[in-house]
Regions:
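Glycine- and small hydrophobic-rich membrane-insertion segments that are intrinsically disordered
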Residues: 23-90
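Extracellular carbohydrate-recognition regions
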Residues: 74-118, 282, 286
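Extracellular beta-strand elements of beta-rich domains used
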Residues: 106, 268-270, 394
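Extracellular glycan-recognition surfaces and repeat-rich motifs
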Residues: 112-135
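Periplasmic peptidoglycan-binding/tethering modules of Gram-negative envelope proteins
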Residues: 123-128, 237-324, 357
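Secretory/extracellular carbohydrate-interaction modules
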Residues: 130-201, 209-210, 272-274
């Protein structure tokens, strides 16, 4: 009996000893599976963040109603969309020009080619599709120029979208004159610093938050004679009253990039005009045409970038209590006629409602109408014409 018990103990000990590697193997296998699952989740999260950054290409030619010319939604410092006149947008003063002289979102350029309407200088660049939007992608240092049909006006605005995930992604824009090397130029994302530079060094620059490198940046330049202002998203990074930035028929761009960290650009919009005295124009001409009121894509929701234009309208109406206006929405001919008509009507109504709520303007002083594509001010056969037709007008009553 003792012998049998002893043998049983030996067998159990053998089984436990021999199974130990199997248990360890199971533990190791489980650990590997958990590690892989965590890595997969991290990859999925990264992809979702990139996708989130690229969503909402409101500057594309897919809709006929007046849209923003930039990609993505306006964000506050916390990453959430905000209303006009709120948060970081309270003191924002960029107003887009009202006569577009160049626009290209590369929607008509074949993927893999260099953009049809830009002038190639050097480097490795191509049109690439990224999250439903076409971009100029530079995988190495490169140069190109934007040719203009006329010299850049004394009062101008320039807008485009930039994406570059690392400090190796930098952009410079010069004025295209014969003496451009002696003039100021715009430099963006030079180790996160953005602003105005010249041969002597920086004229004015600001270090933008690191988070800007992690999402699409809306870049804007506003010029009025020698006065140049540069903006990245809601932040003004240069405010120079005596800049030497010149005017010519082209805008040269220089890109710094890396094969693993490509620089991406899209939604170029160059226009004449900018900030001006709205009341004087309304009295002289009986109407004001503005492209400074922007809406979320396919919606009547007013975007935060509209703050300066809405503020000027609201202040004008409060200062002139006898003034009455009709707010009229217009679109291009892209999309269904009925849809454009309805959207332009709702957007005009949104502007009216905002002025009543924010500035306490009496409803009896405001009218709103939508005309869709029925009253174009330019040909719908060109990107510039379609941009000019997407507008809001104030008509003096």
């Amino acid at each position: 009996m003792k012998t049998i018990s002893f043998l049983c103990i030996l067998v159990c000990a053998f089984l436990l000893t021999s199974s130990a590697p199997s248990v360890a193997g199971i533990g190791g296998s489980l650990k590997n599976k958990v590690t892989k699952k965590v890595e997969k989740k991290a990859e999925e999260k990264t992809e979702k963040e990139i996708e989130k950054a690229a969503q909402g290409s409101s500057g594309s030619e897919s809709e006929g109603a007046a849209e923003s010319t930039t990609t993505g939604e306006a964000e506050s410092s916390g990453g959430e969309s905000v209303k006009p006149g709120e948060g970081v947008w309270t003191n924002y003063d960029f107003v887009p020009g009202d006569r577009v002289i160049f626009f290209d979102d590369f929607s008509k350029s074949p993927t893999g080619d260099f953009p049809q309407r830009l002038q190639f200088v050097e480097g490795n660049m191509e049109v690439a599709e990224w999250k439903g939007q076409k971009w100029l992608r530079a995988a190495d240092d490169a140069k190109f120029e934007i040719p203009l049909s006329e010299p850049l006006p004394q009062r101008f605005t320039i807008e485009f979208d930039f994406y570059g995930p690392s400090s190796q992604n930098t952009l410079e824009m010069r004025d295209g004159t014969d003496t451009q090397e002696e003039h100021d130029w715009v430099r963006l994302f030079w180790y996160l610093s953005c602003g105005l530079h010249n041969q002597k060094g920086e004229v004015a620059q600001v270090e933008v938050p690191v988070r800007v490198k992690e999402r699409i940046a809306h870049c804007r330049i506003m010029g009025d004679g020698k006065y140049i202002k540069v903006y990245v998203n809601e932040q003004r990074v240069a405010n120079v009253p005596n800049s030497s930035f010149g005017r010519s028929n082209s805008l040269p761009f220089r890109i710094w990039a890396h094969p693993n960290d490509a620089t991406m650009l899209t939604n170029f919009r160059i226009a004449e005009g900018g900030k001006k005295i709205m009341y004087d124009q309304l009295m002289a001409e009986g109407k004001v045409v503005t492209q400074g009121i922007l809406f979320a894509s396919g919606s009547d929701e007013i975007r935060a970038e509209s703050t300066p234009t809405l503020k000027e309208i609201g202040t004008m109406l409060k200062d002139h209590a006898d003034l009455k206006v009709s707010i009229e929405g217009h679109t291009d001919n892209v999309g269904e006629d009925a849809a454009n008509q309805d959207l332009s009507k709702r957007r005009a109504a949104s502007v009216k409602a905002y002025l009543m709520e924010k500035y306490s303007i009496e409803e009896s002083r405001l009218q709103s109408q939508g005309f869709g594509e029925t009253k174009p001010v330019a040909s719908n056969d060109t990107p510039e014409g379609r941009q000019n037709n997407r507008r809001v007008e104030l008509i003096k009553l």
